[in-house]
């Protein structure tokens, strides 16, 4: 778990074998992120930014409004959880990024998401 500006981020990733096709260099991963608002006031997630790196060092940047079609308002002490996915051309890679947030007083701030691994289970024994 990573905490920044009284916000804790927890990440879990999983390889989706049923949607992957290694012979076509297509490896599908799902990741679930839990955002825990430790502040005494509500916060809203406005934007996301991801840097996705495959095992060959090739990178893809993804950015946009909110997450999974939402700009969630996360009340004080509450958690928001969502699941999304990434497709890589290699069986292992990483993701890192940040969220742009706004607090109840209208102050913008950024929550960094440190690097986490995407890998098929047989590679991380």
Swiss-Prot record:
PROSITE patterns: APAG. Residues 1-125 form the ApaG domain. PANTHER family: OS05G0170800 PROTEIN. This is Protein ApaG.
């Amino acid at each position: 778990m990573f905490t920044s500006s009284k916000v804790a981020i927890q990440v879990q990733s999983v390889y989706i074998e049923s949607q992957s096709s290694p012979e076509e260099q297509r490896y599908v991963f799902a990741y679930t992120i839990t955002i825990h608002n430790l502040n005494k006031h509500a916060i809203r997630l406005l934007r996301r930014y991801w840097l996705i790196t495959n095992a060959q060092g090739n990178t893809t940047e993804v950015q946009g409004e909110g997450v999974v079609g939402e700009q969630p308002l996360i009340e004080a002490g509450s958690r928001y959880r969502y699941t999304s996915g990434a497709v890589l051309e290699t069986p292992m890679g990483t993701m890192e990024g940040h969220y742009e947030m706004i607090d109840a007083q209208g102050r913008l701030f950024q929550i960094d998401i440190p690097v986490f691994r995407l890998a098929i289970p047989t590679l991380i024994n």
